[in-house]
C-alpha cells in the first residue's frame, strides 16, 4: 500500500502498478477542437472559396477578363463583450466578433485593395468547454461516424458478390464489384452496375491493351494442370524456345502451345491476363459490339479477338444509357455527368482523412502493382509508398481496388470446403481426366461451368465446382483467407469534434453566400468607390451557425446535475445525429462492444434505453488525432522489459502487436517476471513468451470512462450493474453537507479538478484574505519569497467564488473556500470547493452505516429503511433553485403593468411585495396560503377591453388608481407544491437587454431556493447499480444497533446482491468500516482493488479493540456482527454484514413528482385533459384500467370516466350545473374523441352514420 495525494487529502492506495502517464486534461478535446476552428478552420473555409471572381461562371475566360476577384487573407477573433455569468442572467449568447482581412483585386489593372471586414458574432467556448446560447449552458457532443475511405465487403443478395466501395466525405459512392459467378468485374455507379472496363476507358485507359496489362497473373510452366486449365488465356509476354519466338504478346494460349511450353526447360513461368480480366473484356465486347460470335461454331483461336473495337465514345454512351435510360445519350452530357459524379471537386470530396484511408488501404496493392505491372525490382518497390494527395478519385485508385478483389476471390472459397471430402476428390478427378481435355468454356465463367457439371456429371454444388478449379489450378492455395472490412472496427470510424461540426456547417452555408458575393462583385466599376464590407454580408450565415448551436441534435442542453454529469457530457460520443445512425436502427453489431474500443471508448457507460450502444463515453486516456481517429497510449516493451516510453496507437495500428495488461507482474527495473504472459492481439487473447510482447497498458483504468473508474471494486461487479452505477452517479444531487467517499478509487480528485468547479491556485503563494465570496493569494517566487511589483505593491491573485447559482437541472452551484488565511498554496492546489466536492475531491453522496438484513418487509423489492438521524443531521438534504419569470408586454388594449396594486387580492398575499409589485429577496414563499391562493411573486395587471369612459369613471380612476380600472390579474404566482426562499430577483427592460423581444417592456426573473430533505419515495443508490426507494423513516432508537449501542443508519435488502452479482458493494462496506475505525481514507483503483484478506483481517483486529467483534470468527473473519433490535433489545437470529457504504441521493425526488388535479387545461382537438405535471394534467385511464372496471361490472363509473370526466364537453358542463344545484347528474353524451374519429373517417371519404336502437339516424353534431 502507498499514500497518494488527492486534492487536500491523502489516501492509502492499494494500487500496485506504476503509472508513468499522468491523467490528461479531460476536457481538452472540446477546448482544443474549437480553438483550432477559430484559429485555423474558419480561414480554411474562406480560403476554400477564394478567390471569388465576378465572372466566375465563365470558366473559359482568361484571368485578366474575369473582372474583379475577392480573396480572404486572414481571420481573427475579438474579445467577448459580456462575461459568461451575465450572459446566463440576461439570456444572451456568449460570443465573440470575428473579422477577416479581405483583398479585392482588379484583374485587368492588377490594382489591389485590402480591408478588414466584420463577419459577425459567433458563440465562444467558456473555460469549462461549454457554450452559453440564449442564457442556457450547452455542450456540443462528439459524433462518431464511419470514416471516408475504401472498404471491402461481401454481400449476399441472391448470391455472393465481393465489392470495394469508395466512401467519400461528400458525393456519390463508387463501387468496384466482382461477381464470382459471372467472373466479371463491374463498377457500381450511382447504384447501377456497368462493366468495369467500360468505365476505365472513360477515365484515361483508352486502349484495351492498357487495361488488360493492369491484370496479369503467372502460371507455373511445369504444371500441366494449370496450363491446360488456362488454355484460351491471353499472353502478356513473348515466349521463346532457345532464342526463337514461338508466341507473341497478345496471342492466345492454345493447347498445342501449352504442351510445347511443358517441354521447354528454361521457362519457369508465363505471364497471362488474369482470367477474370479476360472474361470482363469479353463481356464488354458482348455488351457493346453489334457483331457477336455467339451461336457460331467455336474454333480454337490463336489471336485475341475484338481488341480496341470498343471506343471511348462507345464506353461513354453505353454507361450513360445504363445510368440515365430516360435521356437521349449524348457524348458531352455523358462526359459531364461522369466527371461531376467522381472527379469534380465541387461535387465530390474524399476529404484529407478519406484520402489518407484510401492510400493506407491501397499501400500493399500498389507495391504489387509496381512489381507485376510496372516491372520494378521487388526490393525497390517495397520502399515506395502510395502517396496520392488528390481529394477526388484517381484512375489508379480504382485499378488498385479492383486488383485487391482478386485476392478475396482467390483466397476465400477453398477455405470454405473440406479439401479431403469425397465430393472434392471426385471433382478433381473429373477435371483431370475429362474436363481439361474437352474444355469449351472460359475457366472463370462459373455459370457456364456449373451448368456443364450439372448436365454432364450430376454435380450440384456451385462451391464444389469452384473449389475444384482453385485446387487444380493451384493458384495461391496456401494463402490464408482475408477478412473483409468491418464498419464497427474503430480503425474505420472517426470522431467529429465540435470544431469540425461547426466548420462543416459554416462551409455548407458559405457556399450559398458565395453566389451573393459574386453578384455584388459584378456591380463594381472601380476599386476606389467600393467598400469591401459592403460586398460581404454573411449575417445570415452567422445566424444559421448560431442556429446550429441552438437546434442541432448534437448541441445539447448540458446535463448539470453535478460536476461528474457535466464532465461526462463533454466527453460523450454519439453515433446518432446528422450523417450518423438512426436511433430506431435494429443493428445489434453497431451497438455491441467491439474489441477495438479497448482504451478508446468505455465498454460500460452507455444509456439503458433506445440509445444503448449508440451513446458512449471516451476512455480516460483516449486521444483524438488530426484525422479524428481515436488513439490510446501504451508503454513500449523491449525484450521483455517495460520501458517508460509511451506510444499512442490507432485501433488499426495495434492489430499486429501483442499487448499485455497493466496488472502483469513487473520487477522494479521493469522486467516482466513470468516467462509466459497473457497478451491481446487483435481480438484474440494469447499466452506468449515475454520476449514477444510489444506493448503494455499504461494503467488499469485505461479501458474505462471517468464514471466507471469512480466505482471501487468494479472488477467484482456484473457489467450491467456497473453500467447502472456509472449512469446513476451522474444523477446524484449535490448535497448541503458534502463528504468524500471513505472508499474511493483515487479518481475523485481528477474528476473534480477537471470539472472546472474546484478552484485551483494559478501560482504559488500565501493566502492573504478569505471570505465566502473570494480568496486573495499573495504570490511567491520559486524560493518562497513574497512578490511585489515595481511600485512596491504586493502581486496578488484574486479568485471570485460562485454563490448560489442555478444549474440547468435546478441544482445549486455554490463554491466555498477550503483554505485559511496564512496558508501556503502551491500551483494547482485546490483552494475552493464547488458543488458535490469535499477538500478538492468529488463527493456525490455520504458515507452511511448500513446493515444488510430484512426488516418487517420494509426493504421488499429493493426498498430502503432509513433512520430519522439522517434527517436530523441533514445528511441527504439538498438545495434546489428554480427560476420563475414573467414579462410585461405592450398589448392591443394598452401596456401590461408590474404593480403591487392588484384588484381583489388579500393583504396577506401582498405583504412580501415591494412598491413595484416584485417580491423582496429573503421572503419565504409557499404555494398555498389558503384554499386556491398561491403566493404572488410578481404583481402584474393586464388591461381589459373597455368602451368609452364617462367623466365619473375618470374621477374614480384618478382617485383609486388601478382599482378603478377594469384590469385582469395576470400576476406570476408560485406553482402548486413549491415552497422556498427568494434568493435573487432580476429586473430587465429594453435598456438592459437590447434583444428583449418585440413588444416586451419589462422582464422579471425570481429565483426561489427550496430545501429538500430526505423523504419517503426518494431514490437512493450506491455506486454498484444498487438502487432503491426510501420505504420508511424510522426513529433512530428503533433502528437495529451495534454491540456498542450505535444504531445503523440504513437497512438494505441482502436479496439484492446474489442475483445482481454486484459483490463490490459488500467489499466496499467492509473496507468502509475499516476506514471509519482507523480514520484513514482508502483508494482501490479499478482492477487493483483490495483483496478480501487485506480487508477482513485488519477489520477484525480493529473491531476487537473496540469490542465490536461479536459475531465474527477470529480464524476466518467474515465482517459480520451481532445486531440487536432497537425496539426490543433482543439480538437478531444471525450475525449481519454491517459497514460504511457510499450512498447517493438521486435527482428523482418524490416531492417533485407528486401531483394532483381537480380541473385544469384540456386539449383543443379531442378535449381530453392534458397529461403530466408540467401541463397540470390529469391521470390517464388506460385500456388496462378500463378492463379492471369492466371486470367489476362498474358500468356507471366507467361511463362517467369515459365521458363527463374526460371529453364529453356538454355533459361535463351539465354535470357541473347539476352538482351546484344539488340535482342528479344527467346521462352522459357523446365523447369528443368519438366525434374526432367520425370526422377523420369522413375525411377519408367514408360515409359514417349512427343509428339508435329504434333505427333512427342520430345527428352527431347536435350533441
Curated annotation (Swiss-Prot):
Catalyzed reaction equations: RNA(n) + a ribonucleoside 5'-triphosphate = RNA(n+1) + diphosphate
Entry's Gene Ontology molecular function annotations: DNA binding; DNA-directed RNA polymerase activity; ribonucleoside binding
Uppermost EC category: transferase
PROSITE patterns registered for this protein in UniProt: RNA_POL_BETA
InterPro entries: DNA-dir_RNA_pol_bsu_ext_1_sf, DNA-dir_RNA_pol_bsu_external_1, DNA-dir_RNA_pol_su2, DNA-dir_RNAP_su2_dom, DNA-dir_RNAP_su2_hyb_sf, RNA_pol_bsu_bac, RNA_pol_bsu_CS, RNA_pol_bsu_protrusion
Keywords per UniProt: DNA-directed RNA polymerase, Nucleotidyltransferase, Transcription, Transferase
Cellular component annotations (GO), alphabetically ordered: DNA-directed RNA polymerase complex
Transferase is among the record's keywords: yes
Single GO BP term: DNA-templated transcription
Domain of life from the UniProt record: Bacteria
Entry's EC annotation: 2.7.7.6
Record-stated family: Belongs to the RNA polymerase beta chain family.
PANTHER family (alphabetical): DNA-DIRECTED RNA POLYMERASE I SUBUNIT 2
Oligomer status and interactors: The RNAP catalytic core consists of 2 alpha, 1 beta, 1 beta' and 1 omega subunit. When a sigma factor is associated with the core the holoenzyme is formed, which can initiate transcription.
Name assigned to this protein: DNA-directed RNA polymerase subunit beta
Naturally occurring in which organism (per UniProt): Thermotoga maritima (strain ATCC 43589 / DSM 3109 / JCM 10099 / NBRC 100826 / MSB8)
Amino acid at each position: 500500500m502507498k499514500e497518494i495525494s488527492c486534492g487536500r487529502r491523502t489516501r492509502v492506495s492499494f494500487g500496485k502498478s506504476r503509472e508513468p502517464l499522468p491523467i490528461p486534461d479531460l476536457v481538452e478535446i472540446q477546448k482544443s477542437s474549437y480553438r483550432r476552428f477559430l484559429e485555423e478552420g474558419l480561414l480554411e473555409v474562406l480560403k476554400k472559396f477564394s478567390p471569388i471572381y465576378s465572372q466566375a461562371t465563365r470558366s473559359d475566360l482568361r484571368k485578366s477578363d474575369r473582372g474583379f476577384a475577392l480573396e480572404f487573407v486572414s481571420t481573427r477573433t475579438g474579445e467577448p463583450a459580456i462575461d459568461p455569468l451575465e450572459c446566463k442572467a440576461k439570456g444572451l449568447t456568449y460570443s465573440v466578433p470575428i473579422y477577416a482581412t479581405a483583398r479585392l483585386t482588379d484583374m485587368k489593372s492588377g490594382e489591389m485593395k485590402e480591408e478588414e471586414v466584420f463577419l459577425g458574432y459567433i458563440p465562444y467556448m467558456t473555460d469549462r468547454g461549454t457554450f452559453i446560447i440564449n442564457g442556457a449552458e450547452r455542450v456540443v457532443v462528439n459524433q462518431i461516424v464511419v470514416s471516408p475511405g475504401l472498404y471491402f465487403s461481401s454481400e449476399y443478395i441472391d448470391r455472393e458478390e465481393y465489392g470495394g466501395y469508395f466512401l467519400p466525405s461528400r458525393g456519390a459512392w463508387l463501387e468496384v464489384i466482382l461477381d464470382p459467378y459471372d467472373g466479371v468485374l463491374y463498377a457500381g455507379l450511382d447504384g447501377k452496375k456497368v462493366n468495369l472496363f467500360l468505365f476505365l476507358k472513360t477515365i484515361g485507359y483508352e486502349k484495351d491493351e492498357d487495361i488488360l496489362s493492369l491484370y496479369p497473373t503467372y502460371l507455373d510452366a511445369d504444371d500441366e494442370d494449370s496450363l491446360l486449365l488456362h488454355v484460351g488465356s491471353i499472353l502478356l509476354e513473348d515466349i521463346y524456345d532457345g532464342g526463337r519466338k514461338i508466341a507473341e504478346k497478345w496471342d492466345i494460349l492454345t493447347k498445342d502451345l501449352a504442351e510445347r511450353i511443358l517441354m521447354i526447360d528454361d521457362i519457369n513461368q508465363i505471364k497471362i491476363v488474369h482470367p477474370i480480366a479476360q472474361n470482363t473484356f469479353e463481356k464488354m465486347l458482348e455488351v457493346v459490339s453489334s457483331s457477336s460470335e455467339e451461336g457460331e461454331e467455336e474454333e480454337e483461336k490463336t489471336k485475341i479477338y475484338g481488341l480496341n473495337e470498343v471506343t471511348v465514345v462507345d464506353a461513354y454512351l453505353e454507361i450513360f444509357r445504363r445510368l440515365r435510360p430516360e435521356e437521349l445519350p449524348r457524348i458531352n452530357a455523358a462526359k459531364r455527368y461522369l466527371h461531376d459524379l467522381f472527379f469534380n471537386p465541387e461535387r465530390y470530396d474524399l476529404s484529407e482523412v478519406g484520402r489518407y484511408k484510401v492510400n493506407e488501404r491501397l499501400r500493399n496493392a500498389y507495391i504489387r502493382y509496381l512489381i507485376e505491372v510496372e516491372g520494378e525490382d521487388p526490393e525497390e518497390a517495397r520502399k515506395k509508398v502510395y502517396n496520392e494527395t488528390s481529394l477526388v478519385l484517381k484512375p489508379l485508385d480504382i485499378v488498385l481496388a479492383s486488383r485487391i478483389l482478386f485476392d478475396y476471390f482467390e483466397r476465400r472459397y477453398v477455405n470454405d470446403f473440406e479439401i479431403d471430402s469425397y465430393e472434392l476428390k471426385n471433382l478433381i478427378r473429373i477435371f483431370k481426366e475429362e474436363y481439361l481435355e474437352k474444355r469449351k468454356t472460359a475457366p472463370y465463367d462459373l455459370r457456364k461451368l456449373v451448368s456443364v457439371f450439372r448436365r454432364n456429371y450430376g454435380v450440384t454444388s456451385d462451391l464444389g465446382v469452384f473449389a475444384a478449379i482453385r485446387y487444380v489450378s493451384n493458384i495461391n492455395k496456401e494463402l490464408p483467407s482475408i477478412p473483409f472490412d468491418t464498419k464497427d472496427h474503430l480503425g474505420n470510424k472517426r470522431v467529429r469534434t465540435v470544431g469540425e461540426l461547426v466548420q462543416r456547417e459554416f462551409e455548407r452555408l458559405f457556399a450559398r453566400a458565395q453566389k451573393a458575393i459574386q453578384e455584388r462583385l459584378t456591380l463594381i466599376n472601380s476599386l476606389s468607390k467600393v467598400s469591401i464590407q459592403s460586398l460581404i454580408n454573411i449575417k445570415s450565415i452567422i445566424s444559421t451557425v448560431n442556429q446550429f448551436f441552438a437546434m442541432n441534435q448534437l448541441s445539447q442542453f448540458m446535463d448539470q446535475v453535478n460536476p461528474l454529469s457535466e464532465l461526462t457530457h463533454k466527453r460523450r460520443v454519439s453515433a446518432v445525429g446528422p450523417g450518423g445512425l438512426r436511433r430506431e436502427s435494429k443493428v445489434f453489431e453497431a451497438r455491441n462492444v467491439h474489441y477495438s474500443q479497448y482504451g478508446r471508448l468505455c465498454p460500460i457507460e452507455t444509456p439503458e434505453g433506445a440509445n444503448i450502444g449508440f451513446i458512449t463515453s471516451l476512455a480516460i486516456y483516449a486521444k483524438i488525432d488530426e484525422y479524428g481517429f481515436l488513439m490510446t497510449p501504451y508503454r513500449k516493451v523491449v525484450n521483455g522489459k517495460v520501458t517508460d516510453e509511451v506510444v499512442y496507437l490507432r485501433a488499426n495500428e495495434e492489430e499486429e502487436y501483442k499487448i499485455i495488461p497493466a496488472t502483469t507482474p513487473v520487477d522494479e527495473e521493469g522486467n516482466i517476471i513470468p516467462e509466459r504472459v497473457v497478451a491481446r492481439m487483435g481480438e484474440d487473447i494469447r499466452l506468449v513468451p515475454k520476449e514477444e510482447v510489444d506493448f503494455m497498458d499504461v494503467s488499469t483504468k485505461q479501458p474505462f470512462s471517468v464514471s466507471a473508474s469512480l466505482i471501487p471494486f468494479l472488477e467484482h461487479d456484473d457489467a450491467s450493474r456497473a453500467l447502472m452505477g456509472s449512469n446513476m452517479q451522474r444523477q446524484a444531487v449535490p448535497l448541503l453537507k458534502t463528504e468524500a467517499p471513505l472508499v474511493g478509487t483515487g479518481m475523485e480528485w481528477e474528476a473534480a479538478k477537471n470539472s472546472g468547479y474546484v478552484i485551483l491556485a494559478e501560482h504559488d503563494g500565501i493566502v492573504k484574505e478569505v471570505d465566502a465570496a473570494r480568496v486573495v493569494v499573495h504570490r511567491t517566487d520559486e524560493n518562497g519569497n513574497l512578490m511585489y511589483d515595481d511600485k512596491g505593491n504586493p502581486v496578488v491573485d484574486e479568485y471570485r467564488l460562485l454563490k448560489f447559482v442555478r444549474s440547468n437541472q435546478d441544482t445549486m452551484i455554490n463554491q466555498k473556500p477550503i483554505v485559511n488565511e496564512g496558508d501556503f498554496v502551491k500551483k494547482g492546489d485546490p483552494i475552493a470547493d464547488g458543488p458535490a466536492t469535499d477538500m478538492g475531491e468529488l463527493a456525490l453522496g455520504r458515507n452511511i452505516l448500513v446493515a444488510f438484513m430484512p426488516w418487517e418487509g420494509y426493504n421488499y423489492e429493493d426498498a430502503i429503511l432509513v433512520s430519522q438521524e439522517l434527517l436530523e443531521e441533514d445528511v441527504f438534504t439538498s438545495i434546489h433553485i428554480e427560476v420563475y419569470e414573467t414579462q410585461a408586454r405592450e398589448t392591443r388594449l394598452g401596456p401590461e403593468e408590474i404593480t403591487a396594486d392588484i384588484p381583489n387580492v388579500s393583504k396577506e398575499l401582498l405583504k412580501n411585495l415591494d412598491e413595484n409589485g416584485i417580491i423582496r429577496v429573503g421572503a419565504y414563499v409557499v404555494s398555498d396560503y389558503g384554499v386556491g391562493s398561491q403566493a404572488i411573486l410578481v404583481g402584474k395587471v393586464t388591461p381589459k377591453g373597455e368602451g368609452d369612459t364617462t367623466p365619473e369613471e375618470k374621477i374614480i380612476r384618478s382617485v383609486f388608481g388601478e382599482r378603478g380600472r377594469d384590469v385582469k390579474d395576470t400576476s406570476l404566482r408560485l406553482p402548486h407544491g413549491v415552497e422556498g426562499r427568494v434568493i435573487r430577483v432580476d429586473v430587465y427592460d429594453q435598456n438592459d437587454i437590447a434583444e428583449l423581444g418585440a413588444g416586451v417592456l419589462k422582464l422579471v426573473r425570481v429565483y426561489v431556493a427550496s430545501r429538500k430533505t430526505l423523504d419517503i419515495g426518494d431514490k437512493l443508490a450506491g455506486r454498484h447499480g444498487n438502487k432503491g426507494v426510501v420505504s420508511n423513516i424510522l426513529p433512530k432508537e428503533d433502528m437495529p444497533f451495534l454491540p456498542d449501542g450505535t444504531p445503523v443508519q440504513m437497512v438494505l435488502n441482502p436479496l439484492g446482491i446474489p442475483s445482481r452479482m454486484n459483490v463490490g458493494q459488500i467489499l466496499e462496506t467492509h473496507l468502509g468500516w475499516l476506514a471509519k475505525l482507523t480514520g484513514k481514507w482508502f483508494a482501490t483503483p479499478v482492477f487493483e482493488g483490495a483483496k478480501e484478506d487485506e480487508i477482513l483481517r485488519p477489520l477484525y483486529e480493529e473491531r476487537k479493540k473496540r469490542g465490536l467483534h461479536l459475531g465474527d470468527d477470529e480464524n476466518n473473519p467474515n465482517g459480520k456482527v451481532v445486531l440487536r433490535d432497537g425496539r426490543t433489545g433482543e439480538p437478531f437470529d444471525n450475525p449481519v454484514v454491517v459497514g460504511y457504504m457510499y450512498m447517493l441521493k438521486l435527482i428523482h425526488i418524490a416531492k417533485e413528482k407528486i401531483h394532483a388535479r381537480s380541473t385544469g387545461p384540456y386539449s383543443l382537438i379531442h378535449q381530453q385533459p392534458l397529461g403530466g405535471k408540467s401541463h397540470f394534467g390529469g391521470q390517464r385511464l388506460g385500456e388496462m384500467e378500463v378492463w379492471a372496471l369492466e371486470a367489476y361490472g362498474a358500468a356507471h363509473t366507467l361511463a362517467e370516466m369515459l365521458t363527463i370526466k374526460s371529453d364529453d364537453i356538454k355533459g361535463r358542463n351539465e354535470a357541473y350545473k347539476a352538482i351546484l344545484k344539488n340535482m342528479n347528474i344527467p346521462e352522459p353524451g357523446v365523447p369528443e374523441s368519438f366525434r374526432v374519429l367520425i370526422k377523420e373517417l369522413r375525411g377519408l371519404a367514408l360515409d359514417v352514420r349512427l343509428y339508435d336502437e329504434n333505427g333512427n339516424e342520430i345527428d352527431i353534431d347536435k350533441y
